[in-house]
Regions:
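Secretory targeting and sorting signals
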Residues: 1-30
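Active-site catalytic motif of lipid deacylating hydrolases and related acyltransferases
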Residues: 31-87
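Active-site glycine-rich loops that stabilize anionic/oxyanionic intermediates
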Residues: 41-44, 97-98, 120
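Gly/Ala-rich beta-loop-alpha elbow adjacent to hydrolase catalytic centers
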Residues: 94-99, 103
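Flexible "cap/lid" loop of the alpha/beta hydrolase fold
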Residues: 110-111, 116-159, 196-199
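Conserved serine/cysteine hydrolase catalytic core
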Residues: 190-237, 241-245, 249-255
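Post-His helix in hydrolase/transferase enzymes
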Residues: 252-266
């Protein structure tokens, strides 16, 4: 499927080049608008992107919000790749939180730019938990009792079981999304998905962000991934970086600003 998409894209590029060489105006349809793929992070599901996705669709973008299984970078990036395999043409790949780890492990020739929203952006051999190192990057409140562990059924785990982490409901609003309304926080809690503890300890592969046009939105009031850690990762990537006065859940609390950055990356 990826090969077919690549051939289609190459053929379209050739047609555009030939038309441009002939001095003929290129019609709007000949420059396909990228499809935006939004990858959610831990303690969330695709509905966390609803506000952003709605704004992008309102501007004419095709948007996909695949399910991130939250099992580990290798497994989860394969799941996202399957979603990308359904897309013809260029792709803007966006990740929030742990979703940044996942998109950093997706290598697709049709990706033209990447956007990280308060997200992990590991380099090769790193694991996400290193970005929460309390010595280098103090400030995360994602600790017990806010962070809890439970056993779950999981085909990826040993003997079909695994240990997952989740945010205790009574701490979710204060730790994860302190800048959203009570009703919004309650809806986010209802959609919370737990993550395999091993996922944040699995070494990342070669980063797809290397050599790629990248944008990074730092959540300046983040209580999950310290802002200093986010700025370090963004700087290492060479990303175009902006700060939002927002919680970790900036995609929910500030969907206009997040959507605007994605549109910039898609232009």
């Amino acid at each position: 499927m990826t090969i077919i998409r690549t051939l289609r894209t190459a053929l379209l590029s050739l047609i555009i080049a030939l038309v441009a060489t002939a001095g003929v105006a290129i019609p709007a349809w000949a420059a396909p608008r990228p499809t935006v793929v939004l990858v959610h992070g831990a303690f969330a599901d695709p509905t966390s992107w609803n506000g952003v996705a709605g704004r992008l669709r309102g501007q004419g973008y095709e948007v996909l919000t695949p399910v991130n299984p939250l099992r580990g970078p290798a497994h989860d990036s394969a799941a996202v790749q399957r979603a990308l395999d359904t897309v013809d043409g260029p792709i803007v790949l966006v990740g929030h939180s742990y979703g940044g780890t996942v998109i950093s492990n997706v290598h697709d020739p049709d990706i033209v730019s990447m956007v990280y929203v308060a997200a992990f952006a590991p380099t090769q051999g790193e694991f996400a938990q290193q970005a929460l190192d309390p010595v280098r990057f103090p400030g995360s409140r994602l600790l017990p009792p806010a962070l809890q562990v439970k056993a779950v059924d999981d085909p990826q785990g040993i003997a079909g079981r695994n240990l997952d982490g989740y945010v205790a409901p009574e701490y979710f609003h204060d730790v994860f999304a302190q800048d959203v309304a009570d009703a919004t926080a309650a809806d986010m809690i209802a959609h919370q998905q737990s993550i395999a503890l091993a996922a944040n300890l699995e070494p990342s592969g070669a980063p797809s962000w290397s050599g790629m046009p990248t944008w990074y939105l730092v959540s300046a009031q983040d209580r999950v991934i310290p802002p200093a850690s986010q700025r370090f990762m963004a700087g290492r990537m060479g990303a175009q970086t902006s700060d939002l006065d927002a919680s970790h859940a900036s995609l929910v609390s500030q969907p206009d600003a997040v959507a605007a950055t994605i549109v910039t990356a898609a232009s």
